[in-house]
Amino acid sequence: MTATKTAALTLLALVAFASNSLLTRLALGTHQIDAASFTAIRLVAGAVMLLALAAAQDRSWSVMQGRGVAGPLALFAYAAPFSFAYLRIGAAVGALVLFGVVQLTMIGYGIARGERPGAMIWLGLVLAAAGLALLTVPSVTRPDPLGVLLMAIAGVAWAVYTLVGRGTANPIAANARSFFWSAPLALVLVLVVIGLHPEAAPSARGIVLALVSGAVTSGLGYAIWYRALPSLTVTQAAVAQLSVPVIAALGAVAVLGEAVSSRLVVAGVLVLSGVGLVLSARARQPRVERSTRA
């Protein structure tokens, strides 16, 4: 693959990942759909897209072969809090919290597994953690605490999902299976919400936004990312993901009309700088885990 094509595919995938935050906030922030229905439609649409791509790749439906409940459970544990968080916080804040928590969880997992971080990695961890903590300090501009907590839970779950799927021979098929088997969990959640709030009725616009989030920015976005990934070094792939919260923030301002506070800017600089330091230090180590964005 040429360098130009790799760059184009990488940029397209990163924009897709950032767009998940924008689409979810656009749908839920304007009350076009309830969070449970958005989650269910997103997972079902993602499953259909990924299954079609995987089947076309293998020219069979053998992609559904495979066991394990950890992937579907982790995916659902990410998708549901992700949606409910965007009832309370903006896309820019949500993308930053998600990115920061995913990276910190992955790094923490490495340390728990025996990695011995040097001074540069510890400095990066402190900076990133400080940036996330800054978002929770009480003030007039503080994001909704419950929304931040829900997104943090989503971040931990996505990190677990990434760790469960690492080293998979066919990542598109593995993602397809996880989306397929997580969808019933989301449908149960919908039934619970309907039981509690029978008046909830998704609008056509809300349904379309959920379908696009599932089929295009999730399903197709992952496929594009995995197409570009073999042509990227581990460091290039990791550093490229630093742009996702920035793209989401720019989109939140341009598309959603969100105001970016000085608190968010400072928190963003701390988180991205901290993660950047960690990635720079880990690039010199023999083994570095790859992760994917939501």
PLM region spans:
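Glycine-/small-residue-enriched transmembrane alpha-helix faces in small-molecule transporters
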Residues: 1-40, 73, 77-81, 130, ...
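Membrane-interface interhelical linkers
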Residues: 1-15, 46-70, 113-122, 140-146, ...
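Hydrophobic/aromatic residues within transmembrane alpha-helices
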Residues: 27, 38, 42, 85, ...
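Transmembrane alpha-helices of multi-pass small-molecule transport proteins
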Residues: 31-77, 101-109, 157-161, 178-194, ...
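Specific alpha-helical transmembrane segments that line the substrate/conduction pathway
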Residues: 37-48, 75-76, 83-116, 154, ...
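Hydrophobic transmembrane alpha-helices of multi-pass small-molecule transport proteins
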Residues: 50, 54, 75, 117-137, ...
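Helix-helix packing/entry segments at the starts of transmembrane helices
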Residues: 94-101, 165-184, 218-254
